[in-house]
Amino acid sequence: MIITWMEEFGVLFVKAFLSLLAIMNPFSSVPVVISLMNEYSKEEIRVIALKASVYAFFILTFFLISGDLLFRFMGITLPAFKVGGGILLFLIALNLVQGEVTKEKGKAHEIEAALRRDNIALIPLAMPLLAGPGSITTVLVLRGYLNTLEGKVALFCAIFLSSFTAFVVYSLSTFFYRVLGRTGINLITRISGILLLAISVQFVVDGLKNLLKH
């Protein structure tokens, strides 16, 4: 029984983690991170990266915990949200495949405002770069899919590991940019977009199936 539970947990965790990592895609934000923190020391960059990942973790965890309450309060059914969320993720994925990251990853005025406020860990690094509309939608839709105890735990662990991955990438942003270059980052972004396209289509298909049953 324990082995079966672990196998089920592992499958759910991998599905949730890959979905979240595809939409968060911290590698695509590396050029933005470098431009924001080019005058900071390595220690300061690590501190800011840690704060940004912690902020993103708590934002996404909040929506994981409060998902049912939000749906009831707004009068939204899960199938309807699957369709709407899937369409939103599909549009975001198209931008990723086409290499148009900045449209979803933060506007120029948000970056300038962050520099003026010296609060880049929260805006734009944590939100919208990591915990933007796409990530929040993914958490809410996955929450409906993984509607068991092991599913909820798997999604929580996926949020934690995705946030930790973002911390590592942001902390080593200069290294990754030097190793991967613009071409490598664009390639990772497009691969993430293709994966997200498949996930978003599945969300829409499942949502439509559930709606047509009623």
Curated annotation (Swiss-Prot):
Locations listed in the record: Cell membrane
Protein name from the UniProt record: UPF0056 membrane protein aq_540
Keyword check for Membrane: yes
Main subcellular localisation: membrane
One Pfam family in the UniProt entry: MarC
TM region positions: 17-37, 47-67, 73-93, 122-142, 153-173, 185-205
Family the UniProt entry places it in: Belongs to the UPF0056 (MarC) family.
Annotated keywords: Cell membrane, Membrane, Transmembrane, Transmembrane helix
InterPro entries registered for this protein in UniProt: Multi_antbiot-R_MarC
Cellular component annotations (GO), alphabetically ordered: plasma membrane
Membrane topology designation: Multi-pass membrane protein
